[in-house]
């Protein structure tokens, strides 16, 4: 089963190019260790929420931009092996020392794929990213499976839902803190891939107007008031 490491980072806006280059160097190491794909999304349409949002998640300052990213592996065993190899690589120590962002505020975790429909495309131009506090896994999968068809009917090329598996509470920032996670809830890391921002804007309008999205399921399996979401322009992808 495909496994994902998910990340959210606050990057100084004027270090955008440095971050892209840094991600490329990181991918070279990750790919050699067994990762199959990496994608980095630069914050473009990231709203400030009332309770939670991506800015709060990483304590982003006014001079920083939120990045939403992930790395894919064939399975959890491959991910664990890659992590061990990377941590022992001298190049990784150099890369960590040169990070163009505050690593102490980066949030990250490991996730099992629940839903993965469509196909990853080398020309993905835009990403909608989501973090959700989910209480009922089975009900969430059923709801997400219905919804993914609507997104793809309106132009999305891929829809992924991933269930928190190796997600630490963190000391400064973390996925659980970002969602004000409660007992019995699990973090879901999710994204929708689009060919471009124009396709995303048109597609999301279609999704919102689609009759299939007008009737929510009885007993939503997550708290929508604490859901975190935003739109990201693709900055780097392997």
Regions found by a protein language model. Give the residues of each.
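Glycine-rich beta-strand-turn "strand-cap" elements at beta-sheet edges
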Residues: 31, 37-62, 88-124, 152, ...
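Short amphipathic alpha-helices in soluble, non-transmembrane regions
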Residues: 20-26, 82-90, 142-147, 203-211
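Short, well-ordered beta-strand segments in beta-rich or mixed alpha/beta enzyme
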Residues: 4-11, 50-85, 126-134, 171-207
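A residue-identity detector for tryptophan
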Residues: 27, 42, 70, 163, ...
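Hydrophobic, helix-prone linear segments
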Residues: 1-27, 31-33
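Surface-exposed interaction/gating patches
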Residues: 8-10, 120-158
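Generic detector of contiguous secondary-structure segments
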Residues: 18-31, 66-68, 139-152, 187-191
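Short loop/beta submotifs within extracellular cysteine-rich repeat domains
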Residues: 15-17, 76-79, 92-93, 137-140, ...
